[in-house]
Amino acid sequence: LQQYPIKGVIWYQGESNAHNMDAHSQLFRLLVDSWRTNWKNPQMPFYFVQLSSLNRPSWTWFRDSQLRLMKSIPNTGMAVSSDYGDSLDVHPTNKQPVGERLGRWALNQTYGHGVTPSGPIYNKVEREGDALVVSFAYGDGLRTSDGQSPRCFEIAGEEGMFYPAQAKIEGDQVRLTSPEVKLPRFVRYGWQPFTRANLVNSDGLPASTFRGDTDSIITIINSCCTMKSDPKKQYSNIKTISGFPAGEAGYDLGVSACYGGFIGDYMVVAGGCNFPEPGKKKYY
């Protein structure tokens, strides 16, 4: 196919990768990079379809992973299709709207037409008192697809227990509260394998499944650890970890050989705790 010039790529993602999103995230990057290399076009547009809705546990995580891929790979776009999913059929039958959504990305990003390319894309979340305020790109005219209150938003505090949130649309933002969560920190939306989430923008295009945090991973780690970092090697020596009683049974002195390496959105930690006899050596 390399002998034929192409303007860009549209990719309909199948379900076979959904069981291993970590492998897929690497393979998908490789796919995009290799095609751009083979066609000698490092900016070649690559637009793809997000997995739809189906009652399989991994699909929620996979959809979120695809959103993160779109944000991290330049000149890509993602067509959300969860609103056309079938809880029992892995192959939704209504493909025309999905094709039209791919076309919006191409018209806007590749051909310069003034059409809205996407539904609301999660941008950031901030805490205001007992509420979380979520901001979106492509969030002009936020509303719901069925005229009901926004649903499928959940928030959690420091402990990570999620509760359904009361959602109020405010311009291009959504304000979230829950009587169960006094100091919210985490948010997620459409976090069901088969979701009936209903947030759309003025063009009627649906928002993607997403999860977010009020703090970056660096802020989170710094809040619970004392670290010494080497930016060249991208590692951190964890000196102490909060929660170990200082001076009691050598807990704080027992943290040894800890390593933290940042790989994209992940932090890999390895090491051990040496506890005095008759304690045991523990790894985490």
PLM regions and their residue ranges:
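Cell-envelope and extracellular/periplasmic
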Residues: L1-I220
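Kelch-like beta-propeller repeat domains
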Residues: I221-Y284
